Regions:
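Extended, subdomain-level signal for the structured scaffold at the beginning of enzyme domains
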Residues: 1-77
Length: 77
């Protein structure tokens, strides 16, 4: 079974804390889903880089994931 990882992102997230794990996990053929905590799928990170999430966090069935990767940033305070 292929592991599944959820990466929720919110406005102001630290891009490197999201993109590096996503890249490495996908290279390892792990299924990674990016979920927006915002009202839009496009989420702007701390440095102005915009990431398009796969779906909204509210639509995610958390029980189906093996791991959560939680990027930091001003949005987490």
């Amino acid at each position: 079974m292929i592991p599944k990882v959820l990466v929720p992102i919110a406005h102001g997230f630290e891009e490197i804390e999201a993109t590096c794990p996503i890249d490495l996990l996908r290279r390892a053929e792990v299924e990674v889903l990016i979920a927006s905590c915002e009202s839009k799928l496009e989420v702007c990170g701390r440095s102005g880089i915009v990431i398009r999430a796969d779906q909204f966090l509210r639509e995610s069935d958390l029980i189906q994931f093996d791991l959560l990767v939680l990027p930091g940033g001003p949005a987490v305070f």
